UniProtKB/Swiss-Prot annotation:
Nucleus is among the record's keywords: yes
Gene Ontology biological process terms from the UniProt entry: anatomical structure morphogenesis; cell differentiation; cellular response to starvation; chromatin organization; hematopoietic stem cell homeostasis; intracellular glucose homeostasis; negative regulation of cell population proliferation; positive regulation of hepatocyte differentiation
InterPro entries assigned: FH_FOXA3, Fork-head_N, Fork_head_dom, FOX_domain-containing, TF_fork_head_CS_1, TF_fork_head_CS_2, WH-like_DNA-bd_sf, WH_DNA-bd_sf
UniProt feature, compositional bias: Pro residues: 61-73
Keyword presence, Transcription: yes
Compositional bias ranges of the Gly residues kind: 81-92
Name assigned to this protein: Hepatocyte nuclear factor 3-gamma
Subcellular location: Nucleus
Low complexity composition-biased segments: 238-254
Lineage: Eukaryota, Metazoa, Chordata, Craniata, Vertebrata
Pfam families, A to Z: Forkhead (PF00250), Forkhead_N (PF08430)
Amino acid sequence: MLGSVKMEAHDLAEWSYYPEAGEVYSPVNPVPTMAPLNSYMSLNPLSSPYPPGGLQASPLPTGPLAPPAPTAPLGPTFPGLGAGSGTGGSASGYGAPGPGLVHGKEMAKGYRRPLTHAKPPYSYISLITMAIQQAPGKMLTLSEIYQWIMDLFPYYRENQQRWQNSIRHSLSFNDCFVKVARSPDKPGKGSYWALHPSSGNMFENGCYLRRQKRFKLEEKAKKGNSATSATRNGTVGSATSATTTAATAVTSPAQPQPTPPSEPEAQSGEDVGGLDCASPPSSAPYFTGLELPGELKLDAPYNFNHPFSINNLMSEQTSTPSKLDVGFGGYGAESGEPGVYYQSLYSRSLLNAS
């Protein structure tokens, strides 16, 4: 009995490690504290994946906890947000935009000009024509045209200098407008402007939005065409005459120019200093009736005037130093010594025969 009791005591010691299911209690872990949030995280509580109350460390159900104390906003908020924007607030915590933002949106829209001040869809020629046709005398001065346009269209009350220059340009460079001088009974400044009688109906059925055709005076057009054709004809005629002159100059042979008469060689010799510059007499007068042996027959005519011929070089040795030829350095002898001349001639002939 006692042993069994002892065994039960040992068994109780071993079975104490396995408690019953009803006696098991899950431990309650304390809620961990979060680090202080910065100002950026406090502004947007919806972006956080965790509930605003904190994190639960244990997945098991826990006992009832005390309700959390209300927390104050941890960081500053934007000035444009409402007072309800806090850490525990919802998306509706962002306040409505202030009146300054609404006013800025209204100013962002483009300023739209009223219809009465819009630019009229008429050209300057149309405006001038309307003003002149509605005048009692069918003519107006330049200042009256300006005033009529500004009274009818408020758009032209601004930037007057720009469109008034265009009006003057249209009056001056269009043939449909004619300048009329003032009559003595209507004194004043400036001439009148009227429509040309032949301009007719320039616009389609009185609609001034588009002109039917541009009016031009036929006289000016004819003068312009004639001047253009005359200019073209003159240009073509001058080009043709220049071509003819060039062709004549090419086809006509070049005429020899007259050479001035040369002065006698004796005078040039006297100017040089008394030297004998007379050309040697030709060999034809001396040998017309002379019969020479076969070995002494004359060769074909030879140019004795060549400065480097053998005849000139040999004659330089026989001639005296004071009687040199000016042209070729001592050719031949004086006219009074024919022997020396024939001696040089025969020596040349013998050299050629050999």
